């Protein structure tokens, strides 16, 4: 079952949030940098009464990410695990995957080649 909750389109970054079988899927398109980090952070912040946050971030549409994006993902991971939930990354483009691996983010946050694999865990 899939429900679309919201869409955020501020400038070069667009974010859509859906729910697939009880898992929040945040689909991101564009560039994640210092100008868009706050928008991404807001999209990844779980509702206070949302229970265990289970989130997959679909990065297939992200063409660029700098350290600002890495920091947002780390904060979202810490928030999710602190609430007995989890965060997974899905379908990063090669340039984003290179950064994720370079900084070791894939050793902290599970990174899957497809959205379907991330949903299955």
Segments predicted by a language model, with ranges:
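STAS-typified acidic loop motif
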Residues: 2-42
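Conserved catalytic submotifs in the C-terminal HATPase_c
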Residues: 20-21, 60, 116
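Glycine-centered tight turns that cap/initiate beta-strands
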Residues: 22, 105-108, 114
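Amphipathic alpha-helical interaction surfaces in cytosolic regulatory modules
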Residues: 31-109
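A charged, well-structured terminal subsegment
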Residues: 113-121
């Amino acid at each position: 079952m899939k429900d679309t909750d919201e869409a955020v389109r501020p400038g070069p970054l667009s974010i859509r949030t859906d729910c697939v079988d009880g898992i929040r899927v945040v689909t991101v398109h564009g560039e994640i940098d210092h100008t868009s980090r706050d928008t991404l952070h807001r999209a990844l912040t779980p509702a206070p009464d949302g229970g265990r946050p289970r989130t997959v971030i679909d990065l297939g549409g992200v063409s660029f990410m700098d350290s600002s994006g890495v920091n947002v993902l780390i904060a979202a991971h810490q928030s999710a695990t602190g609430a007995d939930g989890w965060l997974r990354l899905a379908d990063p483009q090669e340039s984003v995957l290179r950064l994720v691996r370079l900084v070791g983010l894939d050793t902290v946050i599970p990174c899957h080649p497809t959205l379907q694999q991330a949903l299955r865990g």
